[in-house]
Amino acid sequence: LLLFKDIEVHGFASTSYNYNFENPATPTNGNSQNRVYDRDANTFKFDNGELVLVKETPKVGDVGFRTDLNFGSNYPYMNASNGTTMNLENDFDVQQGYVSYNAPIGSGLQIDMGKFTTHIGAELIDGHDGWNYNHSRSYLFGYANPFVHSGVRAGYSLSDDLSVLGMVANHPLGSEVDNNNGKALGAQIAYTVSDNLSIVLNWAGGNTGAGNAVQHANFWDSVIDIGLT
């Protein structure tokens, strides 16, 4: 029982109805290929059901884990973006699955290894702890930002206002499939200027070429949050 006492269980469910006033002849992809989750016109959908099991690592020396299990119509599109073939019948996805260790370095170096959601972008696919109240998403969310990475990351708080993160992953743009022998790198600097202003700078880069081909890609991203009250 002591083994399970610190494990938290979370979850949520989302359903939707989508309508296109242009009344396309073919409802599938009726809202344009440039959409992500809200493509199909005049359609009810169960978008996502999520179950999260997590053991946090708040103290130096703690070992934990996180597993996010998801089911719904959103996931064939997400899996395709991660380098797998689109399969509309495959509605299940392990969105995150990693082990954590709060290493005894300074005030604590947080290390995660496995599959985790990206640190890049203003719109993420994080579940209950990163809830997004809008159903439709921006162009950057679906056709630029990666969704997840498979690898290892380490984060460290230099102060209450400044933190840094480094990552080594299979692919710089989020694919779970490693199509070459190289590894991608990623980094983040997050600074809270005041109660109403925070700045986050993100980067990921590496070779995206298949096999022995060299095709380097770099992804730069900045997020500035401004509070108006």
Predicted segments with their positions:
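N-terminal periplasmic/intermembrane-space "pro-region" immediately following the signal or transit peptide
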Residues: 1-28, 34
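Extracytoplasmic
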Residues: 4, 10, 46-48, 94, ...
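Glycine- and aromatic-enriched membrane insertion/assembly motifs of diderm outer-membrane
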Residues: 8, 37-74
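Transmembrane beta-strands of outer-membrane beta-barrel proteins
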Residues: 9-15, 63-67, 109-111, 164-166, ...
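Surface-exposed coil loops of outer-membrane beta-barrel proteins
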Residues: 22-43, 74-191, 200-207
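Beta-propeller domains
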Residues: 198, 206-210, 219-222
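Oxyanion-binding "anion nests"
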Residues: 217-229
